[in-house]
Amino acid sequence: MDSTLSRRGFIASGLGAAAGALLAPRRSAGAASDRFLIVNADDLGLSAEVDRGLFEAHDAGIVTSASLLVDGPDVEAAIQQARLRPKLGIGIHVSFDDRGKLFTDMQDLAAVQQQIDRQLAAFIRMVGSPPDHIDSHHHMHRLFNVARLFLVAGRRYNVPVRGFSDVVFVGRFYGQPEFGKADLSKISVEVLVAMLRAVKPGVTEISCHPGYAESRPDAIYDREREVELRTLTDEQVKKTISEEGIRLISYRDYNRMSRDAR
């Protein structure tokens, strides 16, 4: 979730050459003027309520990709439902405990590496194939000291790591610009339509968190999920995508396009 970047203060902006050495730019097929959009929903497997909303957004024709929490309480049911939707791309949403709460000691790189390896192995075992992209809960993979570990994993499986490929990441569609403080105006139809109209040629990802409110009292991002779901499935959003000539794709499609362009 985007607010973590600002409150943690460890954005991986200084990786520069190191990141480039590990993960060369991936060139996508298509005309230079083509506008491709990945709409990726985080937190698949977190709960039955979240998963229900996520799948509704996919079934409505807007969400094209999802990031799976392999330690999520609803992960097995989520995978079963995802198999019924072959057009939905699935990546991994690496977390550092069973509900994705912030890991207290990200300086322990051996422990971080162990978690990355364990969760990737679990993903392959449960899903039956590697993820089509790698990211993390609360964007922890962008922390300067651990970003390299994620980049190595991306290179190992030849898949993009969110924020370290030529996919332009747009994370502003989020209802808590300050952690714990809801601002539903940030996830309105008007805001999303403006984002869509601003999509440039190439490949862009808009991150989202659709779902239904959970019954547990400790849910951090809850009613915002339902607002996101309503916004994503609004007819004006679909109309704008069509009018703008935006082509919706998944990370799986992006990977195939990148291979074809080589």
Residues covered by each model-derived region:
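Acidic (Asp/Glu)-rich catalytic clusters
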Residues: 54-59, 77-91, 124-125
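N-terminal secretory signal peptides and thylakoid transit peptides that target proteins
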Residues: 1-18
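Active-site beta-loop-alpha junctions enriched in small/polar residues
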Residues: 42-44, 69-71, 93-99, 137-139, ...
